[in-house]
Amino acid sequence: MSSPLDDKKNDLIASAGKSILGVVPFAGPLLAEIVDHLVPDQRVDRLTAYVKELESRLSSAEETIVRASLNKPEGLALAEDGYIAASRAVTRDRASYIASVVANGLSVEEMSESRQRYLLNLLSELNDEEVLWLRFFFNPVIDGDHEFRNKHEKIFEPARAYIGAPESEIEKASIQESYKEHLERLGLVESKIQFDRKTGVPEFDKFSGKPRTSYTDITHLGRMLLREIGMIEAEPANK
């Protein structure tokens, strides 16, 4: 007699079979292996939202393109990477981001699966708050993107570390600065150093000792990642 957990796994495999992995006959056994051996038991439920999201995104995909993608090693690797990443996702937003990257890689003919795997790995380097901050820097002006900023105002509320500031404020400022520095290290944003107008020398923060920045802007790679996870629309092609 099968256990409830085995039933969940079988249901998950069957559900996924209705989406992209059902296109290629040998993809079903591949998913079964991923679920049975690579995904811890307690994470099976996390894949449900991902499978539904992937199925939704691929429902209008052209089967011949998907079949061609999955017939390539990189395409199968992308599908596998997606399921493994989704098994670690703890929010629906994260599952949606992953599904968007994978679906684009498998269903868009001119899309490189290797590129999508790179972006998926890049996404795995960020926590959910860092993703929101990356989206924040897409439109960094004070009066820009009110709806998005209001929705996440607790995250974006600026913290200031100054001499005599409460410990909680210093900690929050440290986290925010760490997020920005991490995005910079990954090449997703770049900060413009603030210079003294009279001397032309960079200005330094008295508290941290680091150069002050006038503003932080998103890079092309940052825009690409946001576009592929579905947080911004694709830019219209030049006419």
Where are these regions (language model features)?
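Long, helix-rich, hydrophobic modules that act as membrane-proximal anchors or helical bundle/coiled-coil regulators
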Residues: A99-K239
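Surface-exposed polar/charged interaction patches
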Residues: R57-S60, T64, A68, A85, ...
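Non-transmembrane, amphipathic alpha-helical segments
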Residues: L5, L12, A16-S19, V39, ...
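N-terminal leader segment of winged-helix/HTH proteins
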Residues: A77-S107
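Amphipathic, membrane-active segments
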Residues: H37-D81
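Short leucine-rich amphipathic alpha-helices used at interfaces
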Residues: L5-D7, L12-I13, Y50, R57, ...
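Alpha-helical membrane-embedding segments
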Residues: N71-A85, H152-A159
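Membrane-inserting effector segments that mediate pore formation, membrane fusion
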Residues: S2-E53
